[in-house]
Curated annotation (Swiss-Prot):
Superkingdom per UniProt: Eukaryota
Pathway: Cofactor biosynthesis; tetrahydrofolate biosynthesis; 5,6,7,8-tetrahydrofolate from 7,8-dihydrofolate: step 1/1
Name of the featured protein: Dihydrofolate reductase 2, mitochondrial
Compartments (UniProt record): Mitochondrion; Mitochondrion matrix; Mitochondrion inner membrane
Cited CDD domains: DHFR
Name of the coding gene: DHFR2
Length: 187
């Protein structure tokens, strides 16, 4: 079975994605709505999208917002023995998570797969063979960060000039400019 694999991430100019287990910048309402819309919207009636995240990302989400609603939540951890409270599934690696999607309890329920963090999960996905789309919000300034996104290899990934449902013009919120980009690889 072939499921679409996507990463969605917001990066500042220094490729920072986190600081002290939180965003390195103020939350941007329209960027958050974009994240929700992209990761929630299924193209197949009766199916849901699967969001895959690392343990630290899971626990960085405020408890009242866990699990991410209208999505199947899977946490990656080599330490946990069972899914954390609220999570639907647990896997030790991205490969194990992808194998889980072939099992009967998920095979007929999952439409798209969205990797939502953190940095090691993104890196594992970006090095995974096969088709992958990166939905990157480029925050057009630096923020002090302690967690970073890998540089995108433009030899491997092609920046798409446009993508349905993704605004291509510069956005602004809380005096922070940002733009949405979509990159794709197929190896």
């Amino acid at each position: 079975m072939f499921l679409l694999l996507n990463c969605i991430v917001a990066v500042s100019q220094n490729m920072g994605i986190g600081k002290n287990g939180d965003l390195p910048r103020p939350p941007l309402r329209n960027e958050f709505r974009y994240f929700q819309r992209m990761t929630t919207t299924s193209s197949v009636e009766g199916k849901q999208n699967l969001v895959i995240m690392g343990r630290k990302t899971w626990f960085s989400i405020p408890e009242k917002n866990r699990p991410l609603k209208d999505r199947i939540n899977l946490v990656l951890s080599r330490e946990l023995k069972e899914p954390p409270q609220g999570a639907h599934f647990l896997a030790r690696s991205l490969d194990d998570a992808l194998k889980l999607t072939e099992r009967p309890e998920l095979a007929n329920k999952v439409d798209m797969i969205w990797i939502v963090g953190g940095s090691s999960v993104y890196k594992e996905a970006m090095n995974h063979l096969g088709h992958l789309k990166l939905f990157v919000t480029r925050i057009m300034q630096d923020f002090e960060s302690d967690t970073f996104f890998s540089e995108i290899d433009l030899e491997k990934y092609k920046l798409l000039p446009e993508y349905p449902g993704v605004l291509s013009d510069v956005q602004e919120g809380k005096h922070i400019k940002y733009k949405f980009e979509v990159c794709e690889k197929d190896d």
